[in-house]
């Protein structure tokens, strides 16, 4: 596979002004199945398999996330592979990674953006693609947790308490998540909360820029625009969830 990687790099790389194309999820799956050959700096990671023997994964609008494991340490990671181009994504994630590197909190996980990290044999003109590496968060989304525990008054009271503590902590930070919603909040097995999906995050280095998203409709202020991009953009969502 590495020979094919070198061959394609020499013979088929074309210069283009068009938006970068990305592989299909099925093509990423095939690449991850042979992770040791197709990953560069992360070649020591192996995919965690589901009950059907396939790489464990979940997908969203712009990416697919694989559960990977370092067999030397036993630690699991989330490897995010992109399926669509998003303008400014690389620089944004570099800035986010720099901001979060020294944040010591269970509410946030560190992120690492790696350019040209995964080789994928696909119909795209490129054959090497970026990935985002994050700690794997065990648990379930807050939306799922509420659906399963809404009749348990104690569980709901503790969830409300922990959410309000997280909200107070987040509002004291110089950054903002950018897309607060129950689907982007993980409830760990011990009940503690962790924010995931940082695509819309604001960090101080982005001051003066436009937001890449205005959040999710049901949890975003109706008057918010891409020009509203600072450390206060989570206020409406946090208040809406806290009061519901």
Please annotate each region the language model reported.
Residues 167, 171-183, 187-188:
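Catalytic-loop of the protein kinase fold
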